[in-house]
Amino acid sequence: MEITKEIFSLIAAVMLLLGSFIALISAIGIVKFQDVFLRSHAATKSSTLSVLLTLIGVLIYFIVNTGFFSVRLLLSLVFINLTSPVGMHLVARAAYRNGAYMYRKNDDHTHASILLSSNEQNSTEALQLRAKKREEHRKKWYQND
């Protein structure tokens, strides 16, 4: 009985450590990435996983060491994992619609049609026009960069 308690405590500690490490990677990504979209990706994906691992580790620790099952931890785990991606999606969508700066490795729009379905008419031209408008809007707002 004591050995299983130690094993579960070790599993909880490893999950807490992994959650902390992934949160650190998320923080580095937020600082390092160039635009809103990449930063929101770093914040959402890895932070959601780090919160998931951390809360599961805390839940296991409480169950094993105190015999206490926390419904609050379980509910917070569910709500954070449901609302965090949706919230960041809305932030990224608003940034895209407002013409926020979008980092691109190259400005070549010749392969833009691979992102669109084959049944859309004039999709390449529409995508290139949107990219030009976004670039003009970006230059207007971020001309000091």
Swiss-Prot record:
Q: Which GO terms describe its molecular function?
A: sodium:proton antiporter activity
Record Pfam families = PhaG_MnhG_YufB
What does the record say about its membrane topology?
Answer: Multi-pass membrane protein
Task: Keywords in alphabetical order, please.
Answer: Antiport, Cell membrane, Ion transport, Membrane, Transmembrane, Transmembrane helix, Transport
Q: Which domain of life is it from?
A: Bacteria
Among the entry's GO cellular component annotations, what is one?
Answer: plasma membrane
Q: Tell me the compartments it is located in.
A: Cell membrane
Q: Where are the transmembrane segments?
A: 11-31, 51-71, 72-92
**Family according to the record:** Belongs to the CPA3 antiporters (TC 2.A.63) subunit G family.
Under the heading PANTHER family, the entry gives:
ANTIPORTER SUBUNIT MNHG2-RELATED
- Quaternary structure note: May form a heterooligomeric complex that consists of seven subunits: mnhA2, mnhB2, mnhC2, mnhD2, mnhE2, mnhF2 and mnhG2.
Its recorded name reads Putative antiporter subunit mnhG2
